[in-house]
Amino acid sequence: VVKLILSVILELVFTVGVWAQDGQGPQIPSVKIKNVGGTVINTADFGTTDKPVIISFWATWCKPCIQELQTYHALYPEWQEKYGVSLVAVSIDDARNASKVAPFIKSRTWTYEVLLDINQEFKRAMNVNNVPHTFVVQNGKVVFSHSAYSSGDEEELEELLKKLTGKK
């Protein structure tokens, strides 16, 4: 069992590294979902330029998700300035909990785009099995994928942003 888990982890690390180097990850799927303001967004429009887009799947009940997004919130202004990055948080809260999302993000003063994937169509299209799950998209391709969160993951993400944008 340990060997199997280790081999899966190594395969994921290798695959992510390859995506980041050659930009040939899978195409971001086209799913229409609403943002917290009610505007319909097509997910295929994310990351269509060389400016990276961070997409983070989360839920209001997920403590590691909130910890990750709070960390991103603190770093986001600097990352926008340095790397031209955009951040999109995709809530997978279902219809019963979706009404909690807007007040939740308002109380935390998150300034990035928040989408409501109430039917979890985008989640399924991106093969997200658990949250938090973070992707980076550039030129229409998924170039990074990471599941779970622990303190320090944002440093790995910033290193990737440096590589993708050629900035230090």
Regions found by a protein language model. Name each.
Residues 18-22:
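Boundary at the C-terminal end of the N-terminal hydrophobic targeting segment
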Residues 50-53, 58-61, 94, 130:
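Short pre-active-site segment immediately N-terminal to redox-active cysteine/selenocysteine motifs
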Residues 54-55, 87, 134:
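Hydrophobic beta-strand anchors of alpha/beta hydrolase catalytic cores
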Residues 62-66:
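Short, thiol/selenol-centered motifs that function as redox-active sites or metal-ligating centers
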Residues 67-107, 119-124:
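Structural microenvironment flanking redox-active thiols in thiol-disulfide oxidoreductases
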